[in-house]
Amino acid sequence: MAPKRSRRSNRRAGSRAAATSLVYDTCYVTLTERATTSFQRQSFPTLKGMGDRAFQVVAFTIQGVSAAPLMYNARLYNPGDTDSVHATGVQLMGTVPRTVRLTPRVGQNNWFFGNTEEAETILAIDGLVSTKGANAPSNTVIVTGCFRLAPSELQSS
């Protein structure tokens, strides 16, 4: 009686699609009330150094801390969109560090092409008016982005 052949031996080894890799990138900014801070590809050192590789936003984590309270709203954009596709809603920063996670909604997670314009906004954070005093609070914000990179074989030429 002949031994049974495994089904695995019949599969093609090279038929799989190229894998994408996840990259985490962090930037530190100062957020001021009544001001909007925008983040482009050039804001994140790793994305900036990736050349013309396309990327997709998986999630943003926003952590803020400050001596004075400040309300803010973060907005996520798709490539080519002028209107935001998702937002955190009004959040409050204070002396205790708070972390907010912002992810794209299903069906709204498109690829930013490798030749994305430097001025194209990926994320924007609005500092909202939160105090009645004359001193406008300034807050330190840590923005960590998780990006999915396209395989290098698919990069723009």
Curated annotation (Swiss-Prot):
Pfam families: Potex_coat. Gene3D superfamilies: Satellite virus coat domain. GO terms for molecular function: structural molecule activity. Coiled coil: none annotated. The keyword Metal-binding does not apply. It is found in: Virion. One of its GO terms (cellular component) is viral capsid. InterPro entries: Satellite_virus_coat (IPR010392), Satellite_virus_coat_sf (IPR037164). Keywords: Capsid protein, Virion. SUPFAM superfamilies: Satellite viruses. This is Coat protein.
